[in-house]
Amino acid sequence: MMNTILELINVEKGFGEGVRRNPVLSDISLDVEEGEFIAILGFSGAGKTTLMSMLAGLEKPDGGDILFRGETVEGPSPKRGIVFQNYALMPWLSVEANVRLAVDAVHQHKPAKERAALVDWYVAMVGLKHARDRKPSELSGGMRQRVSVARALAMQPDLLLLDEPLSALDALTRAKLQDELADISQKEKKTIILVTNDVDEAILLADRIVPLTPGPNATFGPSFDVNIARPRERAAMNSDPDFIRLRASITEYLMDVGVSAKPETSRVEALPNVVPISLKSTSKPLPAAYREKAQSAIESGYVEFSNVTKIYPTPKGPLTVVDGFDLKMKKGEFISVIGHSGCGKSTVLSMAAGLNPINAGGIILDGREISGAGPDRAVVFQAPSLMPWLTARENVALGVDRVYPKASPAERRDIVEYYLERVGLGDAMHRPAADMSNGMKQRVGIARAFALSPKLLLLDEPFGMLDSLTRWELQEVLMEVWSRTKVTAICVSHDVDEAILLADRVVMMSNGPNARIGNIMEVDLPRPRSRKALLDHPDYYAYREELLEFLEAYEGGASPAEEQLAAIRQKRDQRISRQTCNKRVAAE
């Protein structure tokens, strides 16, 4: 019979006094069994970190009780170890010394030999035996977070609290640390509470998932039991019916309680009939020899990348980052580009934007060669570049005033307000950028890009800095606005689900250097799309599996064998054949 190690009974927490009190958590109740792995899923600002701080004894609740082994939590204790999102290491100490510092403080009554063995065991457990003598400044972000995990584990707590420990890491490093946490939880049989905003991470690691509703007055929603056998593998889970059902149920619940992409009632019902300056392109005309080819490209390839190559000089000689990138896009097509870090995705995008010179080949947009930046292209970067002292409206107006020089002030105002309302900022258009969350800033960036009426919209991991639940919301916003404009678009992403949701085709890049297109997947899913609808579509997980297998083949800088790539192509052909057959049956 399992023993209850932690009890939360009607816990309340807020900040401030009287009428200025900001209620954060309300009526939080939960029982955690010894050895259980709990994942708490929640939106940014819902109070997840506040909750973890109370469990660690760093904050006290305003009401209710938190009981650890039947005793009220009054303050911090080595029995409850915590790892925060931002690792706090002693920069002058080595990996070994950082872990030893915690061991010596908690296990001071143990013999020195036993303490040293504890340090060695946990440094090795997180895969840092080879780096034990390095300082934090010599470690990657993922390695530093491993030190934090090792330090917490070496204290041998009864309860390990993990407050979004992997959210700041790149996808590949995050996946590796997820595997290590899963392995540790099984070896140590430790009771673990993980705060995350990643549904797949929660399902991969947890025995039970507890969603936290959006604040203020956030509370726990219904829990979801994860009845999937361990060890769990991402590729295998993708085709597991239990995983598919659970993932859909959790996603649907979270979207129902917190994600809304519904546009606000707009003051501007229709855009004014004004012509952007981008229709008078400043790109240089094609040489005569290319004109016939360019005319064909306009019909079948509105955008054409022709043998595009990028070479950077290095002390060791020229380094070819992108080697012969070839792609044709139809007008109004949405392309996602996906691949591992360093594969040249952003380099391709920056060349299309005219921000990075091309060493060989060329890019044609609407019959003209791209030779530099221009108003016919708009870019949304990962970090929105806004003037912090200007309001949302003023930030968007900067570009609109330049792109529509012949429009009246009222017409330009209508364009700005139309797109700000489309991205859900109708009530915040007069708020300075400095007072906005990252999600709100990115909404301004999206509104600004669409307001320029570009021929080509370029999105460079536009949601990469946001938590996954905020990403869902902005993906829906992006889809809603794009469906109105049908602008030709390229989106660089490392998120498989995002790539499928947005794109008509997904371009998969091989590893760099000398990166090139490894595969192109056509996404034959109905539009308009929503995350909810896609999760129920019979072909969705087949697309997902194809992308995951491609990324897995190139994981860690690997060069996959031809047999491995052939197997991926064979599955793709089988999927296409099945889809064709299903369409034929439906037509009959």
PLM regions and their residue ranges:
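Conserved ABC transporter NBD signature motif
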Residues: 64-75, 361-372
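Short helical segment in ABC ATPase nucleotide-binding domains corresponding to the A-loop/adjacent helical element
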Residues: 84, 96-104, 116, 393-401, ...
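Helix-to-loop junction immediately C-terminal to a conserved catalytic motif
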Residues: 56, 353
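Conserved ABC ATPase signature
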Residues: 135-139, 143, 432-436, 440
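Conserved ABC ATPase "signature" region
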Residues: 112-131, 183, 409-428, 480
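A short, flexible loop at the N-terminus of ABC-type nucleotide-binding domains that lies
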Residues: 2-5, 14-27, 294-302, 311-324, ...
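Conserved signature/switch motifs of ABC ATPase nucleotide-binding domains
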Residues: 134, 155, 431, 452
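The feature captures the beta-strand-to-loop junction immediately N-terminal to the Walker
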Residues: 41-43, 338-340
